[in-house]
Curated annotation (Swiss-Prot):
Compositionally biased intervals (Polar residues): 22-46
Free-text comment about domains: The PAL motif is required for normal active site conformation.
PANTHER family registered for this protein in UniProt: PRESENILIN, PRESENILIN HOMOLOG
Keyword Disulfide bond recorded: no
Gene for this chain: psenB
Top enzyme category: hydrolase
A Pfam family: Presenilin
Listed Basic and acidic residues bias regions: 79-89
Gene3D superfamilies: Presenilin (1.10.472.100)
Protein name listed in UniProt: Presenilin-B
Record-listed E.C. numbers: 3.4.23.-
Bias-annotated ranges (Low complexity): 54-72
Chain residue ranges for the region called Disordered: 1-141
Amino acid sequence: MSSDNNNDPFDLNEDGHDYFNRVSTTTSPNRQSINSSPKQSSPKSTNNNDDKNNIILDLNDNNNDNNNTNNYNDEDIDVDNKNKFENKDNTYNSNGGSNNKNKNKKKDNKSNNSSDNEEADENTSLISDSEPLLNKKEKDDEQIEIENLDGEDYDDEVSLQDFSSMIVSIIIPVSITMMAVVFFVKYLNNQTLYASTLSYTIAGGSSGGGSGADSITGNSFVDSLIVAGIVLGMIIVTTVAFVLLYKYRCLKILYGWLFLSVGMMLGSFGTTFFQAMLSAANLPLDYITFAFLIFNFTVCGIIGVFWYAHQYVNQLYLVIISVLMAISLTRLPQWTIFTLLVIVAIYDLFAVLCPRGPLKVLVELSQERNENIPALVYETGKGSDSNLKLGLGDFIFYSLLISRAALVHMSCVFSTFIAILTGLFLTLLCLAIFKKALPALPISIFLGILFYYLSNNFLTPFIEALTLSQIFV
C-alpha cells in the first residue's frame, strides 16, 4: 500500500494545483489514520480511483483549455497591437512622419528579404511615394503666397474705398462748426447788446467788427500787423512750451495746463455767449441758476474732452469750443483778422513741414513712443484704421474766416464755405498720397480769402444790382 500511496495521482497535478493536499487538509487526523490502515481492494475503491482519475483528467483538460484560451487572447492582443502600430506608422508616413521609423522599417525589410532587387524596388517605391507629397507642399506654399498677395491688394482697395467715408467724416463736423458760427454771428449781429460788447475793440466803427471806414485800428495795416504779430507770438511760445513739456514727460503739468485752458474757454467765453443769447432772446434767468449751469457745463466739458466719455460727447464739446473761440475772435477788426489768418497759415507750413518745426518734432516724438498726443484734436474714429485727426485750431480759423464773410453778405458765405471745403478735400487727397502729417490751414485759408475777395468785390455788387433792377436769376 505504501507503493500505491507513493504512486497516488492525488499528490500533484501537472499545473501544480495541489488538489490532494486541499482535500486532505479538510479531513480530520482520525480519518487520515483510518485511510492509512491496510485494507483489501474492493470494487468501490476501484470505482473511487476511477472517479479520481476522471476528475484529475478533467482538471488537466480545463487547465489546458485555459492556457490555450490565454495563449489565443495573448496572440489576439499582439495582433491588435501590431495592427495599431502599423496603422500609426502608415498614418505617420502619409503625413510626412519621422525618418527614424522609415529607417527601422528599411532595416527590417533588408533583414527579411534576401534579394537586392526587392530592396531596390522598395527604395524606388518610397521615392515615388514621397515625390507627390513634396509637390503638394510646394503647391500649397504657392497657393498661400498667392492668397497673401491677394489680401494685400484687397487691403489697398479697401483703403481707397474708405477714403470717401474718411472725407465725409471730417467734413461733416467742419461744416457744422462753420454753419453754427454763421448762425450765431448773424443772429447776434442784429442785436444792440452784441454791438455794445464790441465797443472795446472798435472805436467809431460799425457793429460788424470794424468793417466801416472810420474805424481807428481796422483800416490801419500796420496796427493789424502788430496785433497779428502779438497773437502769432503767443501761438509760437505756447507751441514750443507744449513740445518741451511733452519731450521731457512733464505730463502732469501738461494736463493741468490743458484743463485750465479748456475750463477758461468754456467758463469765460461760455458766460459771455450765453448772456448775449439770453439778452437777445429776452429770457430772464437768476444768477444762481446761471452760475450753476455754467459750472456744470464747464466741468462736463473738461471731463468729456480729457476723461472717459462717449465719442460723440467728446466731439460735441470740441465743436462747442471751436464755435465759442471763433465767435470771440470775430470781434477783431477786419484787417487784423485777414492778416492773422495769412500769418498763421504760413506758420502752419513751417511748423509741420520744416525738419525742426515744433509740430513735426511733436508728431515724431509721439510716433517713437507710440503714444497719443495730449492735445485738443478732433478724431473721426478712435481705434479704427480710418482715423483722421484735425487740430482744433483748424476748426477755429476756418470758422473765423467764414464768420467774417457772414458780416458782409450771404453770397460771400457760400463762396467761402465751398472754397474752404475744397481746400480741405485737396489736403486730405495729399494726405492719402504722401501718407504723412500735413498742414490743414494753407490751402483752405488761401482759397477762402481769394473767394472772399472775389465775392465781396464782384459777386456781391452784381447780386445787389440785379436785386435793385428786379431781375432774378
